[in-house]
């Protein structure tokens, strides 16, 4: 097979595999809904053990769908829809919708100037969520995550810092490599996709350890002219 055709083949394969997996996952979800409805008919409470196992299956279905979404996002080229946007709004929106675990404190540090960028904020929001996911998962016992918006003369920055153990080996670049992960679950594509979305818009994604204070990942975008 010609090497230059490999990316197209990978896209086709991922699309086909995701289609074949999504269909049974949808059937499982619908069947779970039917079971819960029938067992809870007339306002009856579900048996705690039954409810627990239904919740486990629902969680596994969600995890499988998340993996499929990551694979597709990694393989396909996103058609950007850029528009003037506020980075302060981006971190506030994410903070308002993110399911923060009870043991984690999420802090926001807005940019007083709130500089404007011309960006696809859906893609940037996805990238931010990937970084925030990694920060939260790095602190299973709890800790603090800070999301900060800032800027310099040419770039606007979105930084997420955590109080976890820091990056493995102290190598900031390694975390952006495809399929790199230190977690027992997941396929290690989230930060790869985050960097991809930033670079598509002329931006960058950088990571570094903060001595004694965990990891710090910064997403940067050009300021609007």
Question: Where are these predicted regions, by residue range?
Answer:
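Short conserved segment of the HATPase_c
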Residues: 167-178
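Conserved micro-motifs of the catalytic ATP-binding
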Residues: 78-80, 116-119, 182
């Amino acid at each position: 097979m010609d090497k230059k055709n490999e990316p197209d083949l990978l896209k086709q394969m991922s699309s086909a595999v995701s289609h074949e997996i999504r269909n049974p996952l949808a059937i499982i979800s619908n069947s779970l809904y039917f079971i819960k409805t029938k067992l809870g008919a007339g306002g009856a409470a579900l048996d705690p053990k039954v409810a627990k196992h239904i919740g486990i299956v629902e969680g596994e279905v969600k995890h499988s769908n998340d993996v499929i979404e990551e694979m597709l996002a990694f393989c396909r080229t996103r058609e950007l829809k850029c528009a003037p946007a506020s980075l302060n709004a981006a971190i506030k929106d994410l903070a308002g919708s993110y399911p923060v675990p009870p043991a984690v404190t999420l802090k926001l540090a807005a940019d007083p100037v709130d500089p404007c960028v011309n960006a696809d904020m859906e893609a940037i929001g996805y990238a931010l969520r990937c970084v925030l996911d990694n920060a939260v998962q790095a602190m299973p016992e709890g800790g603090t995550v800070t999301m900060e918006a800032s800027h310099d003369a040419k770039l606007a920055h979105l930084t997420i810092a955590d109080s976890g153990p820091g990056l493995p080996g102290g190598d900031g670049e390694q975390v952006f490599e495809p399929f790199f992960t230190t977690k027992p679950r997941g396929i290690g594509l989230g930060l790869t996709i985050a960097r991809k979305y930033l670079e598509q818009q002329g931006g960058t994604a950088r990571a570094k350890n903060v001595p004694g204070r965990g990891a710090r990942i910064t997403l940067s975008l050009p300021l609007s002219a």
